[in-house]
Amino acid sequence: MDLEAVKLAFRKNFAEHGELGASVSIWKEGVEVLNLADGWCERDEVRPWNSATIVPFYSATKALASATLLMLLEENGLSPDDLVCRVWTNFPNSSATFSELLSHQCGLAALDQKSSVFDHEEVISAIEAQESNWELGDGHGYHPRTFGFLV
């Protein structure tokens, strides 16, 4: 593992791309082998960024959720080209594939009903009760609040 290249890329992100604040931690076989933190928590440069700075994770979980879904599909003899409704019978878009779901094309980017994101069953019920916001093939829309529930 070339940790010097990681350090260089980290510094370059600040010097050449205007990074405000960032940190990275790399672990190998249960041992932290790199811990970098630099920058500021806000543009006013009041609080320095450190390795304990708490930040929203947002879309970083999408890759992990997608990888998990793809592994589950493979383990169960399914393909990304299979229909979501094969495993989620109440899925509101009966012609959507897992590939379309994972690439934000299934038209369920927002919830029609007001639902608490802390109530999983309520959100799933809201998703199942709504119609797609567009026809498959006609659009694409980032699914920031529904993606995790869809997966």
Summary of predicted features, one role per range:
Residues M1-F57, G77-D82, S125, A129-Q130:
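Short, conserved catalytic-motif segment at the N-terminal edge
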Residues G21, S79-L83, A96-T97, F118-E122, ...:
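Alpha-helix N-cap and coil->helix boundary residues
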Residues I26-A37, S99, Q105-A109, V117, ...:
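N-terminal core-entry segment
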Residues G30-V31, P56-L78, L101, H143-V151:
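Alpha-helical scaffold elements that line and support the substrate/ligand-binding pocket
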